[in-house]
A protein has these predicted regions:
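Cysteine endopeptidase catalytic domains of the caspase/legumain-like
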Residues: 1-171
Length: 171
């Protein structure tokens, strides 16, 4: 309800950052966002990622960058032996890929790792560090989206493996 009412321009890039938990439907792989205090039993309080992507596609902005630092879990009542991978984009996106870019800190069903030296999530720490300039790979004073993605992907993967011996794959 709120997003479409925001007056943007066709030249505006919108950035949305979400941290918390996500639920993966074990029939479809569809991801829903859950409030930090939500429970699997209270699925009515989830918000469909697909719905958010559609709203961003319809918004009057040039591009939207959606950054997600989520711990993912399977939907309630699902078979623990059957794991359906999260589906981050929808087949009927109709131009969405050109206008909505996803940066996902944890692409699999697992807890997103914390990073104690930074006192935040591993993805969030390196996302912020990259935005402050560490991702400026060509040292021209500008952090491009591709540079940020490459930097965050490399750092999160390496630190997760070293810290916990458990890879946290970004997307």
């Amino acid at each position: 309800q709120w997003l479409p009412k925001q007056s943007g321009s066709q030249q505006t890039t919108t950035y949305i950052y979400v941290t918390g938990r996500g639920v993966v439907d074990q029939e479809t792989g569809v991801v829903s966002l859950m409030p930090y205090d939500g429970t699997l039993g209270g699925v009515s309080r989830t918000f469909s990622l697909t719905r958010l992507q559609r709203a961003l596609t319809k918004a009057s902005v040039k591009q939207a960058v959606l950054m997600l630092d989520l711990s993912l879990e399977s939907s309630a009542g699902s078979d623990p032996g059957r794991v359906v991978p999260p589906r981050w984009t929808q087949p009927d996106s109709g131009g969405e890929a050109d206008r909505v870019m996803l940066m996902v800190g944890n692409s699999g069903i697992q807890e997103a790792q914390a990073y104690q030296p930074g006192q935040q999530g591993l993805f969030t720490y390196f996302l912020l560090k990259g935005l402050r300039g560490a991702a400026d790979l060509d040292k021209n004073g500008n952090v491009l989206t591709g540079e940020l993605c490459a930097y965050v992907h490399g750092q999160v993967g390496a630190v997760a493996q070293a810290q916990a011996g458990n890879p946290q794959q970004t997307l």
